[in-house]
């Protein structure tokens, strides 16, 4: 998650100026769902606690590490003991992430999920560690686009214990439009184009970008598919970065937070003119709900084991000149 220096892309100065003006003047819109329960927005996949309602209130200041309990649904996905991706808590047994985070290795025993974690080096009082029971990748993953269908459902072996630091997020679906939404991305990705990392969970406020402008920025209609959405602060050169993959993009609506996107791909942090591209949660919401409903709960649930954190974040990928997974 970085705010790199501005660069001039393939657009000319006049076209770029017009585009930036339109991005500022035109309020972004994105489809999202309003749940039918009183005073709650979005789909809740658990009945035990309210979704999207962190216990910590107040305004967040951009450019600083995220405070504890601000994003209680944040998950750290570990592969062979290292943080590689983010995710979000849906309910007591399910985590939402990106399919490409699990494509590298089909052996689910090598993956672990950490919740209630803010610092990758230090387990907090509410940090919990869970083993993976199964991973379900969307059937269209990489079918029509090199990184399309980039959604994964992760079922845990044991039940998540909710607390002020560990809570589920609400899911967005297509029934209601969010206009000029207050949206934030969170993760432990790179914090600069030089490859610097942070042990602290990072947060970044990002405006949503209308689909036509995202097509224009990427310069080719086939890059952005209907199952994707775009977000990025082009004027201030802010975007998600390598290592943020699978993490949530959430928007506030009536004091509830709806997850509208899953960090998926982009041109990398070195080129801020290209916004981050996210898997659209509203597009996949029915598939998510259907799979959670039909999948049996693991037998004999047991308490989570005590967390034992491995090395700090290690993002072992090169900055690609073209599009890349994040």
Curated annotation (Swiss-Prot):
Known EC number:
3.4.21.-
Keyword terms of this UniProt record: Disulfide bond, Glycoprotein, Hydrolase, Protease, Secreted, Serine protease, Signal
Q: Where in the cell is it found?
A: Secreted
* Domain annotation Peptidase S1: ranges: 60-293
The name of this protein is: Serine protease 38
Q: Which residues are glycosylated?
A: 125
Sequence similarity: Belongs to the peptidase S1 family.
Q: What is the predominant subcellular site recorded for this chain?
A: secreted
Instruction: Tell me the first and last residues of the signal peptide.
Output: 1-32
Query: Which SUPFAM superfamilies does the entry mention?
Result: Trypsin-like serine proteases (SSF50494)
Family matches, as InterPro entries? Peptidase_S1_PA (IPR009003), Peptidase_S1_PA_chymotrypsin (IPR043504), Peptidase_S1A (IPR001314), Trypsin_dom (IPR001254), TRYPSIN_HIS (IPR018114), TRYPSIN_SER (IPR033116)
Tell me which GO cellular component terms the UniProt record holds: extracellular region
Coiled-coil positions: none
Cysteines joined through disulfide linkages: 85-101, 183-251, 214-230, 241-269
Annotated GO molecular function terms are: serine-type endopeptidase activity
């Amino acid at each position: 998650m970085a705010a790199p220096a501005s660069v001039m892309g393939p657009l000319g100065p006049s076209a770029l100026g017009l585009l930036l003006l339109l991005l500022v003047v035109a309020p972004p819109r994105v489809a999202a769902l309003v749940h039918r329960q009183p005073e709650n927005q979005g789909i809740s996949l658990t009945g035990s606690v309210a979704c999207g309602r962190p216990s910590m209130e107040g305004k967040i200041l951009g450019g600083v590490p995220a405070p504890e309990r601000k994003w209680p649904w944040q998950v750290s996905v570990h592969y062979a003991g290292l943080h590689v991706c983010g995710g979000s808590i849906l309910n007591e047994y399910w985590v939402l992430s990106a399919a490409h985070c699990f494509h590298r290795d089909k052996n689910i025993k090598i993956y672990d999920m950490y919740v209630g974690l803010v610092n990758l080096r230090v387990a907090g009082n509410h940090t919990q560690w869970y083993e993976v029971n199964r991973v379900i990748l969307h059937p269209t993953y990489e079918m029509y686009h090199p990184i399309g269908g980039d959604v994964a459902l992760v079922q845990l072996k044991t039940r998540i214990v909710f607390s002020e630091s560990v809570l589920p997020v609400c899911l967005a679906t297509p029934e209601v439009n969010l206009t000029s939404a207050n949206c934030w991305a969170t993760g432990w990705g790179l914090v600069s184009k030089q490859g610097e990392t942070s042990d602290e969970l990072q947060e970044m406020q990002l405006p949503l970008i209308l689909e036509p402008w995202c097509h224009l920025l990427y310069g080719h209609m086939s890059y952005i598919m209907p199952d994707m959405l775009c977000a990025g602060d082009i004027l201030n050169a802010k975007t998600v970065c390598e290592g943020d993959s699978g993490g949530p993009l959430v928007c506030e609506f009536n004091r509830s937070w709806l997850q509208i996107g899953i960090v998926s791909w982009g041109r990398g942090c070195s080129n801020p003119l290209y916004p981050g591209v996210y898997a659209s949660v509203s597009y996949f919401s029915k598939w998510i709900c259907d799979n959670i409903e039909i999948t049996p709960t693991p037998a004999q649930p047991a308490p989570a084991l005590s967390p034992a954190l491995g090395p700090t974040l290690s993002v072992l990928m090169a900055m690609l000149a073209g599009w890349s997974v994040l």
